[in-house]
């Protein structure tokens, strides 16, 4: 018989652990030995912070993968925004979950793995966005010469906003609206993009005036400090802005992707203010110079016109010379008019004298006598004409009265009454037929209802089974042993209890 001493058993000196004990021991060992580590790797599976503010992703290289988590408090302290594929150095501690035997790193600090990694990522992003046309010079907008309102996207505290406001006040005082944002850290990019989009959505006639030009500004810093302005959402927001944008991020030697998307790049925030507004003193001097030039030009113009008018006046003849010929013509016309009036008056006098001789008193008296005779004849004919007219109208009225005899009306009334009596008889007959038809239909439906009801089935010797709730039992599978049932026959109900295994022979099979 073979010995089983080679198998671990109760007599072995190896300690025995439960699953939870060995998991807890591993957790303590890992956390004690790796309580503070620095891990270099590439960010994988990053989807941004969770709704809770925590971020879950993994660090990987070409041979392994390590799960990672950044709690909300540590996430807010990051100086840059993590991105998929970025190589970073994470500082934190390893921990395990005994319930699943998995381990991960809880990151307390994280930074890009050198400027080289960031520059490689920046160059890749630059090439990709340029291929989309976001840096196309044809999209650049001209800055307004004299804006009314300037929008500034920057930190509300610090020297940048003070320099911009001070420079604008010195050059050309106007209204400045500041949209406060964080200019460093994980939330820098989203906040700047939100500010640019927010300014673009302001209505022209709203309580907050829409800016005519935007300045996105930040002081100098390292590549990591300025990384938020390389964010893709910032570049897209600036490229899509309908308001001209001046980028003033970092010093003159610094550059970010927002510089390529903006309509104008300023070396410093102060330079951006100088680009945005002109110098008021220069405008006043230019206006004064142009006003003086205009006044001088107008003086020369009027002098030239005055000299031209004088030369023209000297070339013109005198008033007596101009009016001599018209005056002569007027005198000749007046002389001819006097003679013509005298001749015309003589002709009219001769004409009127001829008519006056025809209007003698005897002629007028004869005309009046003729008119009186005509009036008398008309007065004699008028009574006869009136009598004839009245006689004619009386005859017409008598004829119409004879036509309005009551006999036709009485005949029409009797005919209408007869028609109404016939309609009454037909109505009564139709109602009786309809009532009989409804009665017959009701009797047919009643017979059909009795035929289809289950009472007619009971009359033929069948029965209906109901359960304890009074519902019909349609299948045997719905009945369990010892169920209380009710069987309804033609003449009443009988209570029964279901029994398992009891089978009644089918009487039809023996026939």
UniProtKB/Swiss-Prot annotation:
EC class name: hydrolase
GO biological process: DNA catabolic process
Cellular localisation: Cytoplasm
Nuclease is among the record's keywords: yes
Pfam family, one: Exonuc_VII_L
Keyword check for Chloroplast: no
Main location: cytoplasm
GO function terms (MF aspect): exodeoxyribonuclease VII activity; nucleic acid binding
Catalytic reactions on record: Exonucleolytic cleavage in either 5'- to 3'- or 3'- to 5'-direction to yield nucleoside 5'-phosphates
Subunit structure of this chain's protein: Heterooligomer composed of large and small subunits.
Family, per entry: Belongs to the XseA family.
Name of the featured protein: Exodeoxyribonuclease 7 large subunit
Species this chain originates from: Brucella ovis (strain ATCC 25840 / 63/290 / NCTC 10512)
């Amino acid at each position: 018989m073979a010995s089983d001493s080679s198998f671990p058993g109760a007599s072995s000196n190896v300690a025995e652990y439960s699953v939870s004990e060995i998991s807890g021991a591993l957790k303590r060992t890992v956390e004690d030995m790796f309580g503070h580590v620095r891990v270099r790797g590439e960010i994988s599976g990053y989807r941004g912070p969770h709704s809770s503010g925590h971020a879950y992703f993994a660090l990987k290289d070409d041979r392994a993968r390590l799960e990672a988590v950044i709690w909300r408090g540590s996430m807010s302290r990051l100086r840059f925004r993590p991105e998929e594929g970025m190589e970073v150095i994470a500082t934190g501690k390893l921990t395990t979950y005994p319930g699943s035997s998995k381990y991960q790193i809880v990151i307390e600090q994280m930074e890009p793995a050198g400027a080289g990694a960031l520059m490689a990522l920046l160059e890749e992003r630059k090439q990709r966005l340029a291929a989309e046309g976001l840096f196309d010079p044809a999209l650049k907008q001209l800055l307004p010469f004299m804006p009314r309102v300037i929008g500034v996207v920057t930190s509300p505290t610090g020297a940048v906003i003070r320099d911009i406001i001070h420079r604008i006040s010195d050059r050309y005082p106007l209204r400045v609206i500041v949209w406060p944002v964080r200019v460093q850290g994980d939330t820098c990019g989203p906040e700047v993009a939100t500010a640019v989009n927010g300014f673009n959505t302001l209505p022209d006639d709203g309580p907050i005036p829409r800016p005519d030009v935007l300045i996105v500004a930040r002081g100098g810093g390292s590549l990591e400090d300025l990384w938020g302005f390389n964010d893709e959402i910032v570049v897209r927001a600036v490229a899509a802005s309908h308001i001209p944008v001046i980028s003033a991020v970092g010093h003159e030697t610094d550059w970010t992707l927002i510089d390529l998307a903006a309509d104008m790049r300023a070396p410093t925030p102060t330079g951006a203010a100088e680009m945005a507004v002109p110098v008021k003193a220069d405008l006043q001097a230019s206006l004064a110079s142009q006003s003086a030039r205009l006044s001088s030009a107008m003086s020369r113009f009027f002098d030239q016109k005055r000299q031209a008018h004088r030369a023209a006046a000297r070339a013109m003849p005198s008033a007596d010379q101009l009016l001599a010929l018209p005056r002569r013509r007027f005198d000749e016309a007046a002389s001819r008019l006097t003679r013509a009036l005298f001749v015309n008056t003589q002709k009219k006098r001769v004409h009127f004298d001829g008519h006056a001789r025809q209007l003698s008193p005897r002629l007028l008296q004869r005309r009046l006598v003729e008119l009186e005779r005509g009036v008398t004849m008309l007065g004699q004919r008028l009574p006869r004409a009136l009598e004839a007219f009245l006689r004619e109208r009386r005859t017409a009225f008598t004829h119409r009265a004879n036509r309005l005899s009551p006999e036709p009306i009485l005949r029409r009334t009797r005919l209408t009454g007869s028609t109404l009596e016939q309609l009454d008889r037909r109505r009564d007959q139709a109602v009786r037929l309809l009532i009989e038809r409804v009665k017959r239909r009701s009797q047919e439906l009643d017979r059909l209802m009795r035929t289809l009801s289950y009472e007619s089935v009971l009359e033929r010797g069948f029965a209906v089974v109901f359960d304890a709730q009074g519902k019909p039992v349609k299948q045997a599978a719905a009945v369990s042993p010892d169920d209380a049932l009710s069987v309804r026959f033609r003449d009443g109900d009988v209570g029964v209890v279901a029994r398992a295994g009891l089978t009644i022979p089918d009487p039809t099979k023996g026939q």
